[in-house]
């Protein structure tokens, strides 16, 4: 067992080492270098680049680099791999939407939503699975948008989430979405949280 663990660590560091060039490019904001690297190494698009298991998609999302994220999506080998790429989770359990949700990049979220709809329509389950996915704390992307005070993002994502909305209303420690909005003094979002609650209850 110990040997297996050591071999696993070696493989992980070997993978990260191979992606050192785009990682350093990301640190320096050299997004064209990242684009160029993955144009030549498309099979590594979903490989982890950091010790926290961030892929290029995570990095593009939380760096608020819409053009880079669009470029990476277009480099995917086929449209059916889109869900897999966006659903890949890092150490914190965050997928790409969890990372986009913490920014004010509504246009980025809109691009991803439309891309998913274009690929999988009329089946909306792939999009819904991504929006309802919970990270290690039990947070959905909508919950994270509220927690980070991203009013427009929270509204946009909630408008595109269908079915049961209750999964967005709390996390593992029982902190409600309304409570987190008030604690962060995101009062506009506390109003949105009320609206979501009313929508859930059909009020």
Where are these predicted regions, by residue range?
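Ankyrin repeat (ANK) tandem arrays and their immediately adjacent linkers/low-complexity segments
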Residues: 1-203
């Amino acid at each position: 067992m110990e040997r297996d663990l050591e071999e696993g660590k070696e493989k992980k560091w070997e993978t990260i080492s191979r992606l050192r060039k785009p990682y350093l490019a990301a640190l320096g904001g050299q997004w064209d270098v990242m684009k160029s690297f993955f144009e030549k190494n498309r099979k590594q698009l979903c490989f982890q680049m950091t010790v926290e298991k961030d892929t290029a998609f995570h990095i593009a999302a939380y760096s608020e680099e819409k053009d880079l994220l669009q470029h990476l999506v277009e480099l995917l080998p086929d449209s059916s791999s889109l869900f897999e790429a966006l659903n890949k989770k890092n150490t914190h359990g965050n997928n790409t939407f969890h990372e986009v949700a913490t920014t004010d990049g509504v246009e980025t979220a809109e691009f991803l939503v439309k891309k998913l709809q274009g690929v999988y329509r009329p089946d909306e389950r792939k999009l819904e699975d991504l929006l309802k996915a919970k990270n290690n704390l039990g947070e959905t992307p909508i919950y994270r948008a509220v927690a980070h005070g991203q009013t427009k993002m929270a509204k946009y994502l909630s408008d595109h989430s269908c079915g049961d909305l209750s999964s967005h209303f709390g996390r593992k420690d029982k902190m409600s979405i309304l409570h987190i909005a008030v604690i962060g003094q995101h009062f506009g979002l506390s109003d949105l949280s009320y609206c979501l609650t009313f929508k859930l209850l059909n009020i």
